[in-house]
Amino acid sequence: MECDVINRILNEEDLFDCIKRKSKLTYEVNVGNVIIGGNNPIVVQSMALGGSGDANKDAHEVLELAKAGSELVRVAVNSEQAIKNIPYIRDVLVDNGFDHKMIIGCGQYEIARLVKEYPECASALGKIRINPGNIGFGNKRDKNFEDVIEFAIKYDIPIRIGVNWGSLDKYLASKLMNDNALLSNPKPDYIVLQKALVISAVTSAKRAEEIGLSKNKIVISCKTSKIQDLIPVYTVLSNVCNYPLHLGLTEAGSGIKGVVGSVAGISYLLLNGIGDTIRVSLTQQPGESRTTEVKLCQEILQSIGLKNFNAQVTSCPGCNRTNPKYFHQLVKDVNDYIADRMPVWRNTNPGAKDMVVAVMGCIVNGPGESKHANLGISLPGYGERPVAAVYQDGEKLCTLEGKNIFEQFVSIIENYVSVNYQ
C-alpha cells in the first residue's frame, strides 16, 4: 500500500497540477499605456477617496496612489465639480511622469448627464465605469446607457461595466425571482441572484457592442460582498465571455476581515486562471492611507507568484530556541531597510524586486530556508556558539558576530544587489 502511494506521488504529475495558469485569453483593452487582458500581467487598480471639492487635494491623493504602484486610479464622477477637476488631476499626473490616461471615472446615475454637459473634461478620462443597476431608472435607463456608450465611442474611451450585488438591476432581479418561484423545484435565492449578476453584466456588454462599442473596449466586473458568491459568479463569467475581468469584493469591510476576505477571494480566482485586473476595496481605518489597498494588491500578486514588486523577506515566527526579542527586531530592521531602499533600487537595480532574503531564528530551519533564498541569515539558538551564518545563492558565505550583525548583513545585501542586479 505504501509503495502504491509513493509511486502515485512520483509518477502521476497531474496530482500536483492544481494551479491553473491562464489558458483562456481575454480581449486586450488598452487604457493609455496600460493593457488589461490577453496574456498581459495583472493590472493593479485603486480608488481615491476624493470629494474634498479641492482639486489640488484630490489630485495629490490620486498622485499618492500612483506613486504607491496603482496602475489605474478610479475617482468618483458624481458632480459638476468632480468632472471639472479631471483635467487638472490628469495634468498633475503627467507633470509627475505618469500616464495621462490612468484616471477612471466612476459614474452612477449622474454619469450620462455629466459626460454630455462636460465632454471636454470627461474626455480626459482613460476609462469610464458604469453600473447597469443604477445608470438610470424607468424609461431613462436605456437612454442613459446609450448616451454614455456613444460618448465612449466618440472619444475612444474604454468602459467597465461594473455590476454590484448591492445595486443590482431591480427589474432583472425581480423577473428572475418570479420566474424561479414558478418552477416545480425553485433554486435558492442566492443562486438566482448570482445568475442575475452575470446576466446583467453580459447583456449590458452585448448591448454596448450593438450600439457600436468595440469588444476590445469593454471590461466587466460582478462584485459581491461574500466570497462564496464571488467565486461562482466569476467562474461562470470566465466560461461564457471573453471580456477582461476586474476582480474584487465590494464592501469587503475594514481591518483583518477586509484583508482576509479580499485575499481569499481574489487569490482563489487568480490561481484558477480567472481575472485580468484587481482592486482591494477596504474601508480605511481612521488616519490610514488609501495606499494600503495598493500594497495589498501587490502582496497578493507577489505571494501567489504572478508578479514581483519588492524584494521579499522570508522569516520564521521565532520561538524559545532563540532570543525572540533580538530576532524580531532584526526581522523588522531588515524589512524596514529593504522597504526604504526599494524606491532607489527600482531605478538603479530594477531586478532587486525578485530578490528573496531569509531571516531565520535558529539552526532548525534557518540554514535550509536560507539556502533557498538569494541571501539568508540564520541566528544562533540558545546554547549555540553566538555567531550568525550567512548564505548566498545556496552556499555558506560567512559568519557574523558582535553587536552590529544587522549593519554587517545589510552591507552584504547592498553588495549583492549591486553585483547581481545591475
Swiss-Prot record:
Keywords noted in UniProt: 4Fe-4S, Iron, Iron-sulfur, Isoprene biosynthesis, Metal-binding, Oxidoreductase
A biological-process GO annotation: isopentenyl diphosphate biosynthetic process, methylerythritol 4-phosphate pathway
Pfam family, one: GcpE
Amino-acid positions noted as binding [4Fe-4S] cluster in the UniProt annotation, renumbered to this chain: 316, 319, 362, 369
Source taxon at top rank: Bacteria
Record PANTHER family: 4-HYDROXY-3-METHYLBUT-2-EN-1-YL DIPHOSPHATE SYNTHASE, 4-HYDROXY-3-METHYLBUT-2-EN-1-YL DIPHOSPHATE SYNTHASE (FERREDOXIN), CHLOROPLASTIC
Annotated signal peptide: none
InterPro entries associated with the record: Dihydropteroate_synth-like_sf, IspG_bac, IspG_bac-typ, NO2/SO3_Rdtase_4Fe4S_sf
Functional note: Converts 2C-methyl-D-erythritol 2,4-cyclodiphosphate (ME-2,4cPP) into 1-hydroxy-2-methyl-2-(E)-butenyl 4-diphosphate.
Pathway as given in its UniProt record: Isoprenoid biosynthesis; isopentenyl diphosphate biosynthesis via DXP pathway; isopentenyl diphosphate from 1-deoxy-D-xylulose 5-phosphate: step 5/6
Cofactor: [4Fe-4S] cluster
Class of this enzyme: oxidoreductase
EC number(s) recorded for this UniProt protein: 1.17.7.3
Similarity-based family: Belongs to the IspG family.
Catalyzed reactions per annotation: (2E)-4-hydroxy-3-methylbut-2-enyl diphosphate + oxidized [flavodoxin] + H2O + 2 H(+) = 2-C-methyl-D-erythritol 2,4-cyclic diphosphate + reduced [flavodoxin]
Full protein name: 4-hydroxy-3-methylbut-2-en-1-yl diphosphate synthase (flavodoxin)
A single GO molecular function term of this UniProt record: iron ion binding
UniProt remark on cofactor binding: Binds 1 [4Fe-4S] cluster.
